[in-house]
Amino acid sequence: MLYELVAYGIAQGTAEKVVSLINAGLTVGSIISILGGVTVGLSGVFTAVKAAIAKQGIKKAIQL
């Protein structure tokens, strides 16, 4: 479950950055921007984990 959240968060954040890069045209900064997308994705993972904790209770979330 946790790995799925991580993969989803990274994919979503990276996809958003890739789309914006394609629209802006690929440059040397594109690599940095894609890495930024991974960071955004990880923050999305933390949000999802917080939601899981709130929804299922701390004990269940720790078992993830």
From Swiss-Prot:
Q: Does the keyword Secreted apply?
A: yes
Question: Propeptide residue numbers?
Answer: 1-4
Q: Where in the cell is it found?
A: Secreted
Provide details of activity as a function of temperature. Answer: Displays a high degree of stability when incubated at temperatures between -80 and 75 degrees Celsius for 60 minutes. Autoclaving the peptide at 121 degrees Celsius for 15 minutes had no effect but incubation at 100 degrees Celsius for 60 minutes caused a 32-fold reduction in activity.
Cross-link position per record: Cyclopeptide (Leu-Leu): 5-64
Q: Indicate the transmembrane segments per the record.
A: none
Species name: Carnobacterium maltaromaticum (Carnobacterium piscicola)
The function of this protein is: Cyclopeptide antibiotic that inhibits the growth of Gram-positive bacteria, but has no effect on the growth of Gram-negative bacteria.
Query: Alphabetically, which GO biological process terms does the record hold?
Result: defense response to Gram-positive bacterium; killing of cells of another organism
Q: Mind telling me which InterPro entries this protein's record contains?
A: Bacteriocin_AS48, Circ_bacteriocin
Q: Which residues form the signal peptide?
A: none
* CDD domains found in the cross-reference section: CclA (cd22563)
Q: Does the keyword Disulfide bond apply?
A: no
* Keyword entries, A-Z: Antibiotic, Antimicrobial, Bacteriocin, Secreted
The name under which this protein is listed is: Carnocyclin-A
Record field: pH dependence: Stable from pH 2 to 12.
